[in-house]
Swiss-Prot record:
Residues in Kinesin motor domain copies: 31-359
Motif (Important for regulated proteolytic degradation): 561-564
Gene giving rise to this polypeptide: kif22-a
Coiled-coil zones: 452-498
Keyword Disulfide bond: no
Region (Disordered): 366-413
Metal-binding keyword on record: no
Subcellular compartments: Nucleus; Cytoplasm, Cytoskeleton
Species this chain originates from: Xenopus laevis
Domain of life: Eukaryota
Cystine crosslinks: none
Effect of E563A: Reduces regulated proteolytic degradation
Binding residue positions for ATP: G116, P117, T118, G119, A120, G121, K122, T123
One Pfam family this sequence matches: Kinesin
UniProt-recorded name of the protein: Kinesin-like protein KIF22-A
Length: 651
């Protein structure tokens, strides 16, 4: 950029930064090429056109714009190409785009994207119209022609070319498929070779330009557009057309070269004070401006050589990662408007373009090789002498156990595999295994070469460690036996304490009949744990209030030769049950949330539900009415009553 005028003449230079890439990839540097296209004046009949134009072209590479700080000065910009308002679509395509297409046939990536404010003509540059086709139809037509010409060349007799297309839009930070709209946000991923891809996106094979038209025209109608004060058909999303060219070899080693062409029509930055956006238009504008701001941050980070490039801060920059500082031949067509009302939008676009042309990419060919795996040849088994052969193998096996390890290693070393017939992954694993075995063999050799005195010391130390382990195991068994005996004594003492307690026969009745010892499985009998204590039970008995009554005695027929094992079921006294229900009912009708939560199995949610039901339907008539509440069954009410009555007795 150069400032010119009667008072000042100054030149400003921009810093350069080479993008970082994997060191093993040998590539040539390719700077991002920037072209600027000036849109024609919208109203040709405007008499004030001469005074309202703020941009003027100087030659085929430079232009000047009025300095807003000083109207007597102009700022000059120089780019790779400048196209005035009279330039045709063909001139722009032939001058800036067509030269990058041959790179696709050798497995390299390329990208062309249109940048600029809203209403500056980006979509017209990329799409055009039937009379003046834009960059996209011209590039696809030439690419199809180039692939047919290359396929018919004698040196490419064993090669085939296939071309696929995908078409997506980035609308409000969502990647949407335009070929088959699914209203689904597609993810953006990066493979092990640092290639950006979109899993699940629709791909269509195209063999002719008619196939391309058949898929592209309906998909373009699916793109989101709307009307604003500055543009009747304003793009509300970033559109990305991906053309993938694959060159495949039909003979060994089956090489495959893959080149990708990104044709990107960016949505324009918008000043909502001038566009009058409201509602959904305002939300769309915010998403567009945010992604373009992230794009400017990426360019600044590349120029300043920052360690972190914010590609992942936006779906747009993530998708453009190959185009800016990556591995693609990139061309940016900056569209600007000449009107004075677009002055600051034009100035911002020119500054962004000046920074972008300093970015340097490192393109390289994407090549893969497929290895044919031949089936392993099996030796036919001899029918005669089979028994003798097996005996011979057994004898050789016994002999090998008596021989030294070195002899076995020598025998294994004589058997060699034909690595050329194996899968590369298998070969790699075999080489790693061979390396491990070699290292282990060296360690064994070192052990055998150890002096006799040191070897005897090592063996003695090993025997001592084994004896120590055995001693620790015996000690552990003794400790376990003592622990089991202590537990048995404790259980016996607890049972004797329970038998000596003053619990009367009328209060608790337990089966006291003798039992024959047997290995048959007997029914479990309820017992009181020691930690519950005897004081509470004894105090209850001393008051003369029996808590449980014997309900019914049942006998169960056991295995033959055994006595019948009696079992008991306990039934709670009716007066205690009724008094407990009255206490619970009173608390249900008068208690607060905190008081209700003191009941067993009543939490915050159920307590609020009880109070709400009480306010609508009045007090509960009985506790069983809890089953009328939503989410509480009659079975839950029964267990709730038992739990609270037992809790009151225990307390």
């Amino acid at each position: 950029m150069v400032l010119t005028g009667p008072l000042q003449r100054e030149s400003v230079s921009m810093a350069k930064r080479v993008s970082m890439l994997d060191q093993h990839k040998k590539s040539s540097c390719a700077r991002v090429r920037v072209a600027v296209r000036l849109r024609p004046y919208m109203d040709e009949k405007d008499e004030a056109k001469a005074t309202t134009v703020c941009v003027r072209g100087l030659d085929s590479q430079s232009l000047e714009i009025v300095n807003w700080r000083n109207q007597l000065e102009t700022m000059q910009y120089q780019f790779d190409a400048f196209y005035g308002d009279s330039a045709s679509q063909r001139e722009i395509y032939m001058g800036s785009v067509c030269h990058i297409l041959p790179h696709l046939l050798i497995g390299q990536n390329a990208s062309v994207f249109a940048y600029g404010p809203t209403g500056a003509g980006k979509t017209h540059t990329m799409l055009g119209n039937p009379n003046q086709p834009g960059v996209i139809p011209r590039a696809v037509r030439d690419l199809l022609q180039m692939s047919r010409t290359a396929a018919s060349a004698p040196e490419n007799e064993n090669w085939t070319y296939t071309i696929n297309m995908s078409y997506v839009e980035i609308y409000q930070e969502k990647v949407m498929d335009l070929l088959e709209p699914k209203n689904k946000d597609l993810p953006i991923r990066e493979d092990k070779d640092h290639n950006i891809l979109i899993p699940g996106v629709t791909q269509k094979m195209i063999n002719s330009f008619a196939d391309f038209d058949e898929h592209f025209i309906p998909a373009s109608q699916n793109r989101t557009v709307a009307s604003t004060k500055l543009n009747d058909r304003s793009s509300r999303s970033h559109a990305v057309l991906l053309i993938k060219v694959q060159k495949s070899q039909q003979v060994v080693p089956f090489r495959q070269l893959t080149g990708k062409l990104y044709l990107i029509d960016l949505a324009g930055s918008e000043d909502n004070r001038r566009t009058g956006n409201q509602g959904i238009r305002l939300k769309e504008s915010g998403a567009i401006n945010s992604s373009l701001f992230t794009l400017s941050k990426v360019v600044d980070a590349l120029n300043q050589g920052l360690p972190r490039i914010p590609y992942r801060d936006s779906k747009l920059t993530r998708l453009l990662q190959d185009s800016l500082g990556g591995s693609a031949h990139s061309v940016m067509i900056t569209n600007i408007a000449p009107e004075q009302t677009y002055y600051f939008d034009t100035l911002t676009a020119l500054n962004f373009a000046a920074k972008s042309k300093q970015i340097i990419n490192k393109p390289f060919s994407q090549e893969t090789t497929q290895t044919v795996v031949q089936p392993a040849m099996k030796r036919p088994r001899e029918e005669t002498g089979h028994i003798a052969g097996s005996q011979k193998r057994k004898k050789s096996k016994n002999d090998s156990t008596e021989s030294s390890p070195n002899s076995s290693m020598d025998t294994a070393g004589k058997q060699k595999l034909n690595l050329a017939t194996l899968d590369p992954a298998v070969v790699e694993r075999l080489l790693k295994l061979d390396k491990i075995l070699t290292e282990k063999g060296k360690k064994k050799a070192q052990l055998l070469s150890t002096p006799k005195r040191e070897r005897m010391a090592l063996l003695k130390k090993w025997e001592e460690s084994q004896m120590e382990i055995e001693r620790l195991k015996e000690k552990q068994k003794e400790l376990e036996q003592k622990a089991m005996e202590a537990e048995a004594r404790l259980e016996k003492s607890n049972n004797s304490d329970l038998s000596d307690s003053s619990v009367s026969e009328n209060t608790f009745r337990a089966p006291l009949r003798g039992r024959n010892t047997s290995t048959a499985k007997v029914k479990k009998v309820l017992r009181v744990l020691p930690m519950q204590g005897n004081s509470q039970l004894q105090s209850t008995v001393e008051e003369g209030i029996p808590v449980f009554e014997k309900k019914k005695k049942k006998k169960q027929v056991t295995c033959e030769g055994l006595e019948n094992q009696p079992t008991w079921e306990m039934n709670m006294r009716t007066d205690l049950l009724e008094s407990g229900k009255e206490r619970i009912l009173k608390l249900l009708n008068t208690g607060s949330v905190k008081e209700l939560k003191s009941l067993q199995r009543i939490g915050d949610k159920k307590a609020k539900l009880i109070i709400g039901w009480r306010e609508v339907n009045g007090p509960f008539k009985n506790v069983e009415e809890l089953a009328c509440l939503e989410g509480i069954s009659a079975k839950q009410v029964s267990s709730f009553i038992k739990a609270n009555i037992m809790s009151s007795i225990a307390s």
